[in-house]
Every structure is written in C-alpha cells, then in structure tokens.
Amino acid sequence: MVFYKYSGSGNDFLIVQSFKKKDFSNLAKQVCHRHEGFGADGLVVVLPSKDYDYEWDFYNSDGSKAGMCGNASRCVGLFAYQHAIASKNHVFLAGKREISICIEEPNIIESNLGNYKILDTIPALRCEKFFTNDSVLENIPTFYLIDTGVPHLVGFVKNKEWLNSLNTLELRALRHAFNANINIAFIENKETIFLQTYERGVEDFTLACGTGMAAVFIAARIFYNTPEKAALIPKSSESLELSLKNDEIFYKGAVRYIGMSVLGMSVFENGCF
C-alpha cells in the first residue's frame, strides 16, 4: 500500500487510494502516529464514485472519522490531478458535501467548502466555569458556534499576544463541553486575522485547521463586519486566503507534495488493516 504525503497551510496528510470502502480507523492511528508511523494530521482514503470524480473517507490521527477537512480538500485535489484521477477543475464528494476544486497554478489550489451554519451565540457567562483565574478567555464577551463541515467554537481576543498565552486545559474543557473544535482569533485589520485552533481528534493545538479558519472567517464577517475576502494566519504562519461568494466559503492557498511511503506487511500482520 502506497501513501502520498501532502501539506497545506501547515497541516500534513497521508493520501491513499482504495477501490473498496472499509474501516480504516486502526490503520489511520498507526500510520499517522508521529513516532511509530509515517506521521500526519490525518488520513485521506480516495474512493471511486459513480456521480463524482471521486469521493473520500477522512480520518483524524486518532482514528476518528470527520466529514470535512478544509486543508485536506485542497491536498487531495492536487493529488487527484497529479495522479490523473481528475482534471484541474473537478468535483468530489466529502461525506455529504460536494467540494469543487480549481488548480490555478502548479501548487495554488482553491476549494469550495460550501455553505455554513451559525449554530449558537454563547455569552461568556456560560463558559466561565471552564476558566482558570486570570484566564485570557475571560476577555472574550461572546463565543460563536459555527458548523463549516464540522462544529467550531470561535472567540476573539483584543490582544494578539494573548494567542500565545492560551491554556490547553481550558480549551480541552470547552472542546468536550460543546463537542467542537476551539478557535481563538485576533483581527489585526479588516483583511488579516490570526488564530490558534485546538482540534478534536488531535486533542491539542494544531499548526492549522481549514474548517477552523473558515469558521473564524465567517464569525469575523458576520459579527465584526470584515470584508468578503481575508487572509487567515494560523499557528504555522502559512497564510490562507478565504472568500465568500454567494454565501459559500472558498479556500485558496499553496499545497506541497512531501513524499511517498510504502506500508510493509507487518501492519497487516498486526491486524491494523
């Protein structure tokens, strides 16, 4: 079994083709492990589709499945083109979402995430029990729960430096309380937003999260009147351009091919596949 590793906005993914739909949870846990596997934020299984160029199953590094991953969508789009699975402009199925891909330059990929849902606005009072004394999060008056393929809780701080002082235990508590990824952001100007994401399935801060950046972008647009196009800068410092067109979210940014890995028979013998 051959795995291809791609990176987008600081997220890295292993991509593999399969001609049959199976449960790849155990395989994902093993191959995504940073010390005992190849190391990745997630595993993308590319599957044949009757109605689309292809479809995928996406697994987090802990083996859990997710319906959508924004940066992985751009990575798999480039993979599909480079491996003659699809043309430069194509559409694939991610869970129940149709994702359109446009390859504008050799490694600049735009993907259409589709629409979003504002699930709830949450006053800080509902979250105070999760905060420690002198918590940075106490300065956030309102949190926003937004579905961009997966649920995200978004809050904005007034000081960029506070992004470096976030408490992992607090974010973990919020993640379990709302069953959502947690994003804390700072609007530097109307067109530049910095953020940190605590991600489900990874259970820690990640260098980037595409659907998290989308949720922050939407919250900033709706509640802080930012423009319909902005640069989102995650922990990796790899900027991603997000835009809103006809109420749908578009990502645009660079994707890098890292390399190829081959799975040995030992994994099969251990029952991981």
From Swiss-Prot:
User: What EC number(s) does the entry state?
Assistant: 5.1.1.7
Catalytic residues in the record: C69 (proton donor), C209 (proton acceptor)
Question: Quick check: keyword DNA repair in the entry?
Answer: no
**What GO molecular function annotation could you give as one example from this UniProt entry?**
diaminopimelate epimerase activity
Q: In which pathway does it act?
A: Amino-acid biosynthesis; L-lysine biosynthesis via DAP pathway; DL-2,6-diaminopimelate from LL-2,6-diaminopimelate: step 1/1
Predominantly, its location class is cytoplasm
Q: Where in the cell is it found?
A: Cytoplasm
- Protein name per Swiss-Prot or TrEMBL: Diaminopimelate epimerase
Q: What species is this protein from?
A: Helicobacter pylori (strain Shi470)
